[in-house]
A protein has these predicted regions:
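N-terminal secretory signal peptides and thylakoid transit peptides that target proteins
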Residues: 1-17
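C-terminal segment of N-terminal export signals and the immediately downstream linker at the start
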Residues: 24-45
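Conserved active-site and cofactor/substrate-binding residues in soluble primary-metabolism enzymes
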Residues: 37, 51, 55, 68, ...
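A short glycine/serine-rich beta->alpha loop
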Residues: 40-47, 76-85, 139-143
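Small-residue-enriched, tightly packed secondary-structure blocks
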Residues: 50-98
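Mid-chain, well-packed structural core segment of small domains
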Residues: 100-126
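C-terminal binding/interaction regions
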Residues: 116-169
Length: 169
């Protein structure tokens, strides 16, 4: 059955509108499935096989609603850069702070200063709670380290930091 242009465009727009509504409903359902805290997400990411740096950074990416594929930059930092060196939770947290507060332009000195302040606050918190290097973590404790709990505590600290700074607005 032949259709004139106006009828065709009307039906096309109606179909696209219905698809947009269905897509929005799917997006809301996906968001509901992703609800939770950075600590919850970090635990899930660890259970899925992620290492420290990518687990903490991926949780921050989700919290900050950024594209998840950027997590790839954190992969080499897990396991203390694969050498039991600087802990991946520490380095992943620094990447998360950069994503949250880092300057979008090199000339943004205010953002650079804020990012540095948050990084210092995180570093100070970290060094009060954990050694810097993965190889020292079990040696410094009387009981074996619970890496998942350590990651969740780190994620909770970062989320509180992000929420506090976001509320300053």
């Amino acid at each position: 059955m032949p259709m004139n242009r106006r009828t065709f465009l009307g039906k096309s727009c109606a179909s696209l509108g219905a698809l947009a509504i269905l897509d929005a409903a799917a997006l809301r359902a996906q968001s509901a499935a992703e609800e939770g805290s950075m600590a919850d997400w970090t635990g899930r990411h660890l259970n899925e096989g992620n290492w420290s740096a990518d687990a903490i950074f991926l949780s921050a990416i989700k919290f900050l609603k950024q594209p998840e594929d950027i997590v790839r930059v954190s992969m080499p930092f897990g396991g203390g850069m694969g050498q039991k060196d600087l802990c991946g939770y520490l380095t992943g947290g620094f990447m998360a702070i950069g994503l949250f507060a880092g300057p979008k332009k090199a000339s943004d000195n205010a953002a650079r200063k804020k990012c540095s302040q948050l990084a210092k606050e995180y570093y100070d918190w970290w060094t009060k709670n954990y050694p810097l290097h993965c190889g020292e973590i079990n040696k410094s404790q009387t009981e074996p380290c619970d890496y998942k709990l350590m990651g969740q505590k780190t994620a909770a600290f970062l989320q509180a930091l992000f929420e506090r700074e976001s509320n300053k607005g």
